[in-house]
Curated annotation (Swiss-Prot):
Pfam families: Ribosomal_L23. InterPro entries: Nucleotide-bd_a/b_plait_sf, Ribosomal_uL23-like, Ribosomal_uL23/eL15/eS24_sf, Ribosomal_uL23_CS. The keyword Ribosomal protein applies. Keywords: Ribonucleoprotein, Ribosomal protein, RNA-binding, rRNA-binding. Gene3D superfamilies: 3.30.70.330. Part of the 50S ribosomal subunit. Contacts protein L29, and trigger factor when it is bound to the ribosome. The gene is rplW. This is Large ribosomal subunit protein uL23. GO terms for biological process: translation. Signal peptide: none annotated. PANTHER family: 60S RIBOSOMAL PROTEIN L23A (PTHR11620). One of its GO terms (molecular function) is structural constituent of ribosome.
């Protein structure tokens, strides 16, 4: 069993983009930024508990941080993980919270 404290640290934020909006409309899929060390099972449990929805599947990927220049110096942005969470038919997550 995964601790409740860990579940709260797994999901960092919803990832809003043109592609994620199309996925949400057509495939009932929501996209989240998650902790880099989070597993699919942890993501599934966290979404189910926090948003009280049934999760069908979870797909994850790691985006590698880009190398950026600041004048003569080079730096690197952090790697981050993204999770595509497919919800069960009829389930919905409302991020705006409008009533």
């Amino acid at each position: 069993m995964i601790s409740e404290e860990r579940l709260l640290k797994v999901i960092l934020a919803p990832h809003i983009s043109e592609k994620s909006t199309v996925c949400a409309e057509n495939n009932n899929t929501v996209v989240f930024r998650v902790a880099i060390d989070a597993t699919k099972a942890e993501v599934k449990a966290a979404v189910a508990k926090l948003f009280e929805v049934e999760v069908d599947s979870v797909r994850t990927l790691v985006n590698k941080g880009k190398t950026k220049r600041h004048g003569a110096r080079t730096g690197r942005r952090s790697d981050w993980k993204k999770a595509y969470v497919t919800l069960a038919a009829g389930a919905d997550i409302d991020f705006v919270g409008a009533e």
